[in-house]
Amino acid sequence: MPKRQDIKSILIIGAGPIVIGQACEFDYSGTQACKALKEEGYRVILVNSNPATIMTDPGLADATYVEPITPEVVAKIIAKERPDALLPTMGGQTALNTALSLKRMGVLDRYNVEMIGAKPEAIDMAEDRALFREAMARIGLETPKSMLANATEIKDADRKTHEAARTELKAKLSGAELDKALDNLENQWNLGETDRKQRYISHAMAIAAQAIDVVGLPAIIRPSFTMGGTGGGIAYNRSEFFEIIGGGLDASPTTEVLIEESVLGWKEYEMEVVRDKADNCIIICSIENIDPMGVHTGDSITVAPALTLTDKEYQMMRNASIAVLREIGVETGGSNVQFAVNPKDGRLVVIEMNPRVSRSSALASKATGFPIAKVAAKLAIGYTLDELENDITGGATPASFEPSIDYVVTKIPRFAFEKFPGASPILTTAMKSVGEVMAIGRTFAESLQKALRGMETGLTGLDEIEIPGYEEGEGSKNAIRAAIGTPTPDRLRMVAQAMRMGMSEEEVHENSKIDPWFIAQLKAIVDMEARIREHGLPQDAENLRMLKAMGFSDARLASLTSKRPKEVAELRNSLNVRPVFKRIDTCAAEFASPTAYMYSTYETPFVGAARSEAQVSDRKKVVILGGGPNRIGQGIEFDYCCCHAAFALKDAGFEAIMINCNPETVSTDYDTSDRLYFEPLTAEDVIEIMRAEQEKGELVGVIVQFGGQTPLKLAEALEKNGIPILGTAPDMIDLAEDRDRFQKLLMKLDLAQPNNGIAYSVEQARLVASEIGFPLVVRPSYVLGGRAMQIIHSEGQLQTYLLDTVPGLVPEDIKQRYPNDKTGQINTLLGKNPLLFDSYLTNAVEVDVDALCDGENVFVSGIMEHIEEAGIHSGDSACSLPSRSLSKETLDELERQTTALAKALKVGGLMNVQYAIKDGTIYVLEVNPRASRTVPFVAKTIGAPIAKIAARVMAGEKLDAAIAAYGEKPDPRNLKHIAVKEAVFPFARFPGVDILLGPEMRSTGEVIGLDTDFALAFAKSQLGAGVDLPRSGTVFVSVRDEDKEGVLSAIRILVESGFKVLATGGTQRFLAEQGINAEKINKVQEGRPHIEDAIRNRQVQLVINTTDSNKAISDSKSLRRATLMQKVPYYTTMAGAEAAALAIKALKAGNLEVKPLQSYFN
C-alpha cells in the first residue's frame, strides 16, 4: 500500500538523556526515523532534551524542540504545532510512557492527533503485565507462573472522579475559557500525584504479600512500564521480597509489579521481528544470551544468531514470536520478544515483549545491516515490506527478505562499578551496564576474543583472572564454584579460569548453568592457550593463521609466550598472515552489496587464498577513530563529534572512513560514513585497516581527537607506523597531559595554576602532599572522566587513596609481573602514569571554555560558567552558556588566555580549557587539545556545528573558511537566549552508594534547558533531568557557616513563593536573626524524630544542604540517600539553590513556554 496522504506532519518523541537501560541506541533509531519521514515529504516535529544527540541537530527535523520530555511540556508542543500524528516507538520507554500519558490526559483527542507505529491498546497490552499474560494464554503460549500486585480498583475510582469533573466543565464552558479550566484541572490532578501514588503503593503491597504462597521464593519481580528492569530484581528471602516490591511499585508509572516464579538457570533467547499492516512478518535476527536467565539481557553477553537451537526449536520460537505480535496488535514496525527455555525438558515460556524499537533492535540492525528503525518508520506511514527496498543491497532485494548471516556476532556489556564504591557487582534482572561492545567473526571464538579486546578494560583476550577467596586446599573448589555460579561482569573469565585450574566442563555447566556448547568453545580456547604456553608460537603460516582465526590478538599471543606484541606482529607479517575484510550485506553474499560495512577475519578458504571484499577506493580519504563502548566519562558526546567529522569530510569531498565497535551509536550506522569498519579499537586492528586502505588512493590522515581517550591512546602506535595524524600533533596532546612540560608552558605564557606537584611513587606522593598541604586534589594522569580523582582532606584519607584506590588502576600485565608485591605494582604503574596533585581551591567558580583553532586563528565558541563550585567534575556540573555572573573584563581575560594556549599548543581543531576563578585570579586547571563532552551543548546553543568546522580545519581548511561553510560566524557572548546543561545520574540503580558529587565523574548523560530567561532555562534543565521541582510545600535547609549568608537569597525567594522552612539548630538561629521564620528539626545524629524521618514521611519537598568536614559528610549520607529514594530535589551549592528557587518562582507564575531550536537562530 502506498504511503498515507491524509497525514502532513508527524511528532517524534525522543528518549531524552542517556541513562542505564536507555542509551545511544535511541539516537540511532530516532535519527533514522527523522530522515526516513522527511525523505517521504512529511513535516517532522521532534522533542528531545538531550543536546548530545544527532537527532536534535537543527537540520534533521523541521521543528526541533530541545525541551523536557514530560506529558505537560509535550502537550504544549502539540498545542503549538498541531501535528496530525505521533510516532512513539523511537524513543524507548520514555516515549511510550509519555505518549500513553498524553492519551490518558485527553491531549491527543483534544488536538485530533493519531498515534502511529503502535496503537495505545497494543502498548498497554504489551507493557501491562496482567494484559500481556492474558494475551499469551489466548494464543496458547505459556508464561511463567505469576501473580500481579497493583491498585487498579482504587486507581479506576480516582480516574472516574477526575473524568466526571472534566465532563462537568465541558458541559458548562467552551472555547478559551474551557481550555483554561481543563488546564487548571490537570494541574490540580498532577499536584496530587505524590499522595495518590503512596495510597496505590500501600494497597498493592498488601496484595503482593499473598504472592509468596502462590509463586514461592526465589521470585522474580518485574515492574510494568519501566525500562532496563528498573525497580525489578530477584528476591531470595522475605525481606528482599518486600524491599524490591516497594521499589518496583514506586518505579512503575502504573504502580504495578508482576511477581513471577523463578526460571533462574534457564536459557534465554530474543527474536527481533518486523510486521507490516498487510500482516507480512519477518524475523530480522535471533539473539541468544550466554548468561542464563536471572541476568538482564542488557547485562548479558549475547550472540547472534542463536547458536544452540535445533532447527525445530528455532521454527517453534519464530512462529511463537510472530503470533505474539499478531495478538498484541503491533500492526507496523519492529518488536522484540523474549523467551526462556528449560534445558532439562525444553519447556518454552514467553517472558516479555517490547512493542517498539529497543536496545536489541539496534544490536540486530548492526548485526545484520537491516535498518530496523528506518523500515519501522516507513511502515508506520502505510508502506508494506515488499514495497520498500533494502538499502544495503542497493535495492537488489526488498525489505521483505529476511536477513541471513554467515558470521557470528558477540556483544559484551561494559560496567562502571569502580565509579560507585559500595555498589554490588552481582548482576540481576535490573540492568547495571553503561555501554556495550560488539564484534564480528567467522566463528564464535574469533568474535568473542575480538569483543573482549574491544572492551578497553585492558584485556587482550580471555585473560587470566584471580578467583576471589581462592586458597590451595580443601575449600578451594568452593571458591571456584561460587565465582562461576555468581553472575558478575567477569563470570566468563572465571569460567575459563576454573577450567585452567582443572574443573571439568560438566562441573562448570552444573555450577554456572551456561550451555555446554559455549563451555566447550571456551575450553577449546583455554586448551589452545596451554599448547601455546608449552610449545611457543608456531613458525609457519598455516598454524599461525589458525590461531588468529580463533581470535587470538598479537598482544594475547605475546603474553602467552613472554614476547612483545611487536615481535608477534613482525612474525605474522613475515609469514604474510593478514586478515581479510568481509561485508555485512543482509544476504550472506547472495547479492552484491554496494554498502561498505565491513569486519575482519582470518578465515582460511578450502581452495586458494581468502578473498577480501574491502574493494578499496582510489579517492582521498580520512579515517575517523570512534570512541568504542560507552562508559562514564566517554559517551555519546564523542560519538556526536565523530559523526559530525564524517558529515563534514563528505561535504568537503573526502572519503570518510569510520572505525568503531559500539552497536548503539549513529557512527556505526551504515550511511553515516562512506566506509565503516566494525572493529575493536586496538593498535593491531586499526593498523591492519590502515594497510588495507593504503593499497589504493591517498590516506590523508587519521582523526584521533574526536573519540575521547580511546583513539588518543593509539596515536603513538599509528605515528610509529607512518600513518599521518590530522589536527593537533600527538606531541602537543602529550604536552598538555604531561605535568612537567605543561607547567613550563604556563610559566612561559605567564598563566597561573594552583600550587601542584607530581609523584612517581608512593613515597613521593606523601612528600608532595605534605608540601602542598590539605585539602588537595589528586588524580592519575592520562585518564578521562576524572577516573580515581579525589579531594583529599587528611593524611589518613591520602593513605587510603594510595593503598586502596590506586591498586584498582593497576593493569593485569603489571599484576602478573609482581604477583605478591602491591607496592611494586603501584610504583611500576606510577613510573609510567604518575599521580598529579593540585591545591584545592575552595569556593572557586569553575569555567569551561571550548575553542577552535587552525594553528594561527582562534575562535572561542563558548565560555560556560559552572553552577557547582570547582571540585565537582565538569561532566557532573550544571553550567550555563553564556555566563551569568562573570564580568566583561573576566570574560575578555579568559578569551585572551585561551587564545594564547591554543596558539602555543599549535591546536588544529578543537580545544577545551578548564579554569577556576578565586578572588579575582584565573587559574588554569587543565587543557585538553581535543574534542570535549561540551561540544554538542555549545553547538546547539550558539547555532554553529563546531565539530564539523573543526574536522574541516583538521583536513587543511582555514578556520574562517570552515566557519563560513556553515553560515555566519556566531557571537557566543551576546546570545538572546541562555542554555543550562544539567547532568543525569544512575544512583537509583546502585543502592547503598553515596550520591555526593566530587572530582570523579559519575553521570551517564545530560539534558539542556533553553530559554530567553535563566530561571526558566534552569527549570527546564531540572525537569529534563527528571527532577520534579515542587511548586509548594516545605524546604529543609542546613548549611555550613560560610554558606549561611549565601543561602539567604534562595530562602527568601522560596518563602515569598509560599514555602515553609525547616532547619537544623545553627541554621535556624541564623535565619531567625535575618527575620525568617523556620521550624527547628533534629540532625540524624541528634535523635528522633529527625530530618531523615521527615523526608521518608514526605513532609519535605526540597533540600538545601552543605557540609564542612569528612565526619559531617559521612553523617549526612543517609539523608542524601533518603532524598534520592523519595525523589526530593537536593541542592549542595548556594548557586544551585538560588537557581532552583528562581526556577520554582518562574514555574509557579506559569511562564514556561516552548520554542523550536530553529527559532532561536531565525
Swiss-Prot record:
Q: Which residues bind Mn(2+) 3?
A: 914, 926
Q: Which InterPro entries match?
A: ATP-grasp, ATP_grasp_subdomain_1, CarbamoylP_synth_lsu, CarbamoylP_synth_lsu_oligo, CarbamoylP_synth_lsu_oligo_sf, CbamoylP_synth_lsu-like_ATP-bd, CbamoylP_synth_lsu_CPSase_dom, MGS-like_dom
Listed EC numbers: 6.3.4.16, 6.3.5.5
Cofactor(s), names only, from the UniProt record: Mg(2+); Mn(2+)
Q: Where does Mn(2+) 4 bind?
A: 926, 928
For the ligand (Mg(2+) 4), the binding residues are: 926, 928
Molecular function terms, GO-annotated:
ATP binding; carbamoyl-phosphate synthase (ammonia) activity; carbamoyl-phosphate synthase (glutamine-hydrolyzing) activity; metal ion binding
Q: Which SMART domains does its entry note?
A: CPSase_L_D3, MGS
**Residue positions binding ATP 1:** 129, 222, 228-229, 261, 263, 268, 294-296, 338, 352
Record region (Allosteric domain): 1027-1162
Residues annotated for Mn(2+) 1 binding in this entry: 338, 352
Q: Name one GO cellular component term.
A: cytoplasm
Q: What residue spans carry the region label Oligomerization domain?
A: 457-614
What residues bind ATP 2, as annotated?
779, 839, 841, 846, 871-874, 914, 926
Free-text cofactor note: Binds 4 Mg(2+) or Mn(2+) ions per subunit.
The entry's Mg(2+) 3-binding residues are: 914, 926
Q: How does it assemble?
A: Composed of two chains; the small (or glutamine) chain promotes the hydrolysis of glutamine to ammonia, which is used by the large (or ammonia) chain to synthesize carbamoyl phosphate. Tetramer of heterodimers (alpha,beta)4.
Mind telling me what this protein is named?
Answer: Carbamoyl phosphate synthase large chain
Species whose genome carries this gene: Agrobacterium fabrum (strain C58 / ATCC 33970)
Phylogenetic classification of the source organism = Bacteria, Pseudomonadati, Pseudomonadota, Alphaproteobacteria, Hyphomicrobiales
